[in-house]
Regions:
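Helix-turn-helix DNA-binding module
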Residues: 76
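Gly/Pro- and small hydrophobic-enriched strand-loop and loop-to-helix capping segments
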Residues: 88-94, 111
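Conserved active-site beta-strand element of glycosyltransferases/polysaccharide synthases
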Residues: 97
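Flexible, glycine/small-residue-enriched loop-and-beta-strand segment within the central core
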Residues: 1-73, 100-101, 106-109
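Short beta-to-alpha loop/turn elements within the nucleotide-binding domains of ABC transporters
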Residues: 73, 84-85, 91, 100
Length: 111
């Protein structure tokens, strides 16, 4: 976890795998960051088999209320993830990304 990190109430870090969080990251209420997933095969799932994939959150990122960040995702520096978004794939730096599945709708200019 980097400097000047803030996570609001009811946030969840499901960290069986590694979560890396940069500097100046703000996480709103009810955000979930998940690093593990269950096997798709029913027999393996019943045996409790899980896989983990790291999550990386860059510097100056804001993740808005109720967003879910799924295993293996990287969110690039200076990006904003909209409220209620489900981040299933990497988000490039300087992006405003929203929706389910989350997609980039605009590039953010840095001042």
């Amino acid at each position: 976890v980097g400097d000047n990190f803030f996570m609001n109430v009811y946030g969840k870090l499901m960290d069986s795998g590694k979560i890396t969080i940069g500097n100046n990251v703000f996480i709103a209420p009810n955000v979930s960051i998940i690093t593990e997933e269950h096997a798709m095969d029913a027999v393996q799932r019943a045996q409790g088999l899980e896989y983990t994939h790291p999550v990386t959150i860059g510097d100056n990122v804001w993740i808005c209320t109720g967003a879910i960040v799924l295993p293996g995702v990287t969110i690039g520096d200076n990006s904003v993830i909209g409220a209620g978004s489900v981040v299933t794939k990497d988000i490039p730096p300087n992006s405003l990304a929203v929706g389910n599945p989350c997609r980039v709708i605009r590039t953010l200019e840095q001042e």
